[in-house]
Amino acid sequence: MLEIELAIPEFTAPKTANDLARKLNNRQSLLLIAYDQAKPVAYKLGYQLNENTFYSWLGAVLPEFRGQGIAKQLLLAQESWVKAQGFMAIEVKSMNRFKTMLQMLIAHDYHIISCKPAQQSTEVKIRFRKQLG
């Protein structure tokens, strides 16, 4: 997963193993990785936010593998697992600069629940929530 994280040109501050350990410490979590042959090409990582909500924290697809539906497959697999674990909702944050992600979330019934302003409009943080079941 960190190998993919480091190869994403849009990520100006890639996460480290320490970042992951701090965030996931003692939380129920899920890491999904998509492979092309034996090469990891995409991932989706999330964790339990509270008793009823799962937070989809990180995800990325290597540039040369985008447009193939991999992110959608990971999103749907994550939703299925989260629902099976008994969570009632999934939350995720994105930014205006990730237009494809915003479109995918809206297309899959994620609703905007808040926005955090930024000096540049591309950096506005948008929080989405999807009710499950």
Predicted features and spans:
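Acetyl-CoA-dependent GNAT
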Residues: 1-57, 62, 118
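Short acidic/polar active-site loop segments enriched in Thr and Asp
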Residues: 52, 88, 111
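Conserved acetyl-CoA-binding loop-helix of GNAT-fold acetyltransferases
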Residues: 61, 67-80, 107
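Conserved short alpha-helix immediately C-terminal to the canonical SAM/SAH-binding motif I
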Residues: 74, 98-101
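Conserved GNAT acetyl-CoA-binding A-motif
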Residues: 82-94
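Conserved catalytic-core motifs of GNAT/GCN5-like acyltransferases
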Residues: 91-95, 106-127
